[in-house]
């Protein structure tokens, strides 16, 4: 099954007007793999700036979160309609930092995923285990438990990208090996196939966690690793190398 390679850049709570402009200008000036779909996710205040400045047809923008209801009295939240209004095509949901710092449950993430999809935003759905869960041999149990509430609510997965991001690898420099990522991605796809059928073969499963310009090429021949969700390196020139890692 041929799946379009996908590279997301999650800027998290980083950036300024000047630095976001510089990142977008670097992407505009670079030769990017035309077969790779690229999505950048700057902080909310800079989404419109990024969208209006981008000149590459293969690059779009994403919100870092969205709410599971429409506009209203929800201080501090952002709606799907607002993200679409500034040109966002995607939203990142379920990131481990949202799960831990903001105490978001898998059930609520499933609600937000369904609402986003029903209202026209594509979703990058993040799953992944902690170091203690990994050491206890519970990786697959954890990711399945994170997927199950979404599986219960979503019938059409064509606009979902799953990002497997082991919590122990995020921002630590301890990336999973390409072989380990392939094995886990294969298991995730097999579980999906059991639950949602043949469409699982079309769902892109990307890896996140200390991906950089040096290690991204090691994943090149892994059939179930369909791209990357990149954190810190997406703010640096090496992001272009990651985008072009399959060339």
Swiss-Prot record:
| Top EC group | isomerase
GO cellular component terms? cytosol
- Catalysed reactions listed for this entry: D-glyceraldehyde 3-phosphate = dihydroxyacetone phosphate
Instruction: Cite the CDD domains for this sequence.
Output: TIM
Q: Name one GO molecular function term.
A: triose-phosphate isomerase activity
Q: Which GO terms describe its biological process?
A: canonical glycolysis; gluconeogenesis; glyceraldehyde-3-phosphate biosynthetic process; glycerol catabolic process; glycolytic process
Ordered alphabetically, the record's keywords are:
Gluconeogenesis, Glycolysis, Isomerase
List the cysteine pairs that form cystine. none
InterPro entries, per database record: Aldolase_TIM, TIM_sf, TrioseP_Isoase_bac/euk, Triosephosphate_isomerase, Triosephosphate_isomerase_AS
Active site (record annotation)? 95, 165
- So where does substrate get bound? 10, 12
Q: What EC identifiers does the entry list?
A: 5.3.1.1
Which SUPFAM superfamilies does the entry mention?
A: Triosephosphate isomerase (TIM)
Q: In which pathway does it act?
A: Carbohydrate biosynthesis; gluconeogenesis; Carbohydrate degradation; glycolysis; D-glyceraldehyde 3-phosphate from glycerone phosphate: step 1/1
Instruction: Work out whether the entry's keyword set contains Isomerase.
Output: yes
Similarity-based family: Belongs to the triosephosphate isomerase family.
Subunit (UniProt): Homodimer.
Q: What is this protein called?
A: Triosephosphate isomerase
Instruction: Write down the species.
Output: Yarrowia lipolytica (strain CLIB 122 / E 150) (Yeast)
Q: What are the leading ranks of the lineage? A: Eukaryota, Fungi, Dikarya, Ascomycota, Saccharomycotina
Q: Which gene encodes it?
A: TPI1
């Amino acid at each position: 099954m041929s799946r379009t390679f996908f590279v997301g850049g999650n800027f998290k709570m980083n950036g300024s007007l000047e630095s976001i402009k510089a990142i977008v200008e670097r992407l505009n000036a670079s030769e990017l793999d035309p077969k790779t779909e690229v999505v950048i996710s700057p902080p909310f205040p800079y989404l419109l700036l990024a969208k209006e400045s981008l000149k590459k047809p293969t690059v779009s923008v994403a919100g870092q979160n969205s709410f599971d209801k429409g506009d209203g009295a929800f201080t501090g939240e952002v709606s799907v309609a607002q993200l679409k209004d500034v040109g966002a095509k995607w939203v990142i949901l379920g990131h481990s930092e949202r799960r831990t710092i903001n105490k978001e449950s898998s059930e609520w993430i499933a609600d937000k995923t369904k609402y986003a999809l029903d209202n026209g935003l594509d979703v990058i759905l993040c799953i992944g285990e902690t170091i203690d869960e990994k050491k206890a041999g519970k990786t697959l149990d954890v990711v399945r438990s994170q997927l199950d509430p979404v599986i219960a609510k979503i019938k059409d997965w064509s606009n979902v990208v799953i990002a497997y991001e082991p919590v122990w690898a995020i921002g630590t420099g301890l990336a999973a090996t390409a072989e380990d990522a392939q094995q886990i991605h294969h298991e995730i796809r097999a579980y999906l196939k059991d639950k949602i059928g043949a469409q699982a073969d079309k769902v892109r499963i990307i890896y996140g966690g200390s991906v950089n310009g040096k290690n991204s090429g090691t994943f090149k021949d892994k059939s179930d690793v369909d791209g990357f969700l990149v954190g810190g390196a997406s703010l640096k020139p090496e992001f272009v190398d990651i985008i072009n890692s399959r060339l």
